[in-house]
C-alpha cells in the first residue's frame, strides 16, 4: 500500500511539472485567429461600440481606481486609452469600506459627436461622464439620479432626439424606462 501511495505521488508530481511547463496561449494567435479569453484580466460586464473603424469598450470596475476605456481595431487586440475618473470622492471609498462597490455594468454610447458613459454605484446612484474624444479628458462625474441599487444602465436617443434610460435594479429587479433630458443629465 505504501508503494502504491508513493507511486501515485510521483505521478502527480510528474504531471504537475508537465502542466506547469506548458505555455498558455490566449488572445491573438497571429494567424487571423484568436483563443478566448482575448483579455486575460477581469473585464466583467463589457459594453462595446463601434465609431468609425475603431471599437471602444468599458467594463465594471469593482475597485476605485477609475474606469478604463479600451480601444481596438479588430475586437481582439485591446489597449487602455483613458480613464473616466481617477477615484471616487464618496465617503468610505478611500479606505476600502465598500470593497466590491465601484462602478457596475457601464454603458458607452456615441451620440451627437460625443462619447457618453453611464454606470451605477451600489449606494450613490446613476453616474454619467462625457468626452468628445475617447482618449479624454472626461467630464467630472455627474449624478444623474440617486438610486441606490441601480444596475445595467442603457441610454439611447430616439430618432426625434428624445433621450431615454433603461435600467434594472440590484438582484435582477424590474426593468425601468425613464425619459432623459437631451443633455443626458436628468431622468
Language-model-detected regions and their locations in the chain:
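Bacterial Sec-dependent N-terminal signal peptides
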Residues: 1-22
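Carbohydrate-active catalytic/glycan-binding domains of CAZyme proteins
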Residues: 21-187
